[in-house]
A protein has these predicted regions:
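Residues within well-ordered alpha helices
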Residues: 47, 53, 152, 196, ...
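Short, glycine-/small- and polar/acidic-enriched structural segments
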Residues: 29-161, 165-169, 178, 185-191, ...
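Short, low-complexity disordered leader/linker segments with a strong preference
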Residues: 1-30, 328-331
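Soluble non-cytosolic domains of exported or imported proteins
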Residues: 66-70, 85, 139, 143-144, ...
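Secondary-structure end/capping motifs
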Residues: 229-311
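Conserved C-terminal helix/tail region of periplasmic/extracytoplasmic solute-binding proteins
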Residues: 300-331
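Alpha-helical structural context
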Residues: 155-156, 200, 264, 307
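Pocket-lining segment of extracytoplasmic ligand-binding domains
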Residues: 90, 171-265
Length: 331
């Protein structure tokens, strides 16, 4: 009789363990994330992946390159991805087109512009006035890099339409090659291209647009309003993983961050990754928490308006959900 009881207890224990394992396995949720480009600028996202923060939250991330704001929004709206990492201006463009299921910003990743002004010639004692009369190779019209670029130029008394020759009809992927081939006196470049050009003697970094622009929701995680309603717990877990990564990046050295994200940039030397991370950390480009506040939102719309690209003024609470981020931070 005792043997039978022991067998029953053993069997019940086995069933319980098996059930818990099966339950845990079923809780893993796959989330498709589309990133507008693949960049060291998004270091906290890769830290969340490499340090296992998404895994801790029971999320399996399918990271896809959607390359370009328009393509990223198309993928999100057509359910090709669940969450987009892209500039917040895209959510305003979609809203202005009368979207019945608007795109909601729920977790901010970067809070400054990520581009740098690179001069073909070495410049001593650089001043923004030196751009007057020059040829400036800018970014795509309507995108955040170009709008911030124009905002900063105007801030320093340089009219991008009349004080210089502004070239902005070159595809994003070809801008660096165009400058290397001899087009333009100045160019607006992301890292690590800016540092590579400096190392190779093709250009010289003379200013940071990120330092000059102030805080803006430059790159944000967003999704459709319906997805948040139907998958609120998933969005909360996702935001929690990002916040863990943001705190990790803030408290670790550029070298440690570089080592963590190196597997996602196999073609980039580790010392260059470290240089880029240090530059972005130094100028406060990485958001330290996922909250997109009203001041940043209004700054974004001011920049868009100055560039003539703001289709309609949108209140912060309409396209930004801070409840999830605030809840995660308060835990």
């Amino acid at each position: 009789m005792r043997l039978i009881k022991s067998s029953i207890v053993l069997f019940a224990t086995f069933i319980l363990i098996f059930s818990l394992a099966a339950c845990g396995k079923s809780e893993v949720q796959k989330v498709r994330v589309g990133e507008v480009t693949h960049s060291i600028f998004y270091a906290p996202q890769y830290v969340a992946l490499s340090e296992g923060f998404f895994e801790e939250e029971g999320l399996e991330i399918d990271l896809q390159g959607t390359f370009g704001g328009d393509k990223t929004m198309t993928a999100l709206l057509s359910d090709g991805i669940d969450i987009a990492l892209v500039g917040s201006e895209t959510s305003i463009y979609v809203y202005a087109q009368g979207a019945t299921d608007p795109v909601i910003n729920f977790a901010q990743l970067t809070q400054t512009d990520g581009t740098f002004l690179v001069s073909r010639e070495k410049v001593e004692n650089f001043s923004w006035d030196q751009l007057k009369g020059s040829t400036f190779l800018g970014q795509r019209k309507g995108g955040m890099p170009q709008m911030v670029g124009e905002f900063v130029l105007n801030k320093h008394g340089v009219d991008p339409q009349t004080d210089l020759e502004l070239i902005q009809n070159i595809e994003f992927a070809n801008i660096a090659n165009a400058f290397a081939s001899g087009t333009g006196d100045y160019v607006q470049l992301f890292e690590p291209t800016a540092s590579i050009f400096e190392q190779e003697g093709k250009g010289h970094i003379v200013a940071s647009f990120g330092k000059e622009s102030g805080h803006v929701p430059y790159t944000t995680f967003m999704t459709k309003e319906s997805y948040i309603k139907e998958n609120k717990e998933v969005v909360e877990k996702f935001t929690r993983a990002i916040y863990k990564a943001q705190k990790w990046v803030e408290t670790h050295s550029a070298k440690e961050v570089a080592e963590s994200i190196a597997p996602y940039f196999e073609d980039t030397p580790i010392d260059l990754i470290e240089t880029v991370v240090e530059r972005y950390k130094e100028q406060g480009s990485f958001a330290t928490d996922p909250i997109l506040d009203e001041e940043e939102w209004n700054n974004l719309q001011t920049i868009m308006d100055d560039a003539g690209e703001l289709p309609t003024d949108v209140e912060h609470g309409i396209l930004v959900n801070t409840d999830i981020a605030e809840s995660v931070i308060s835990e």
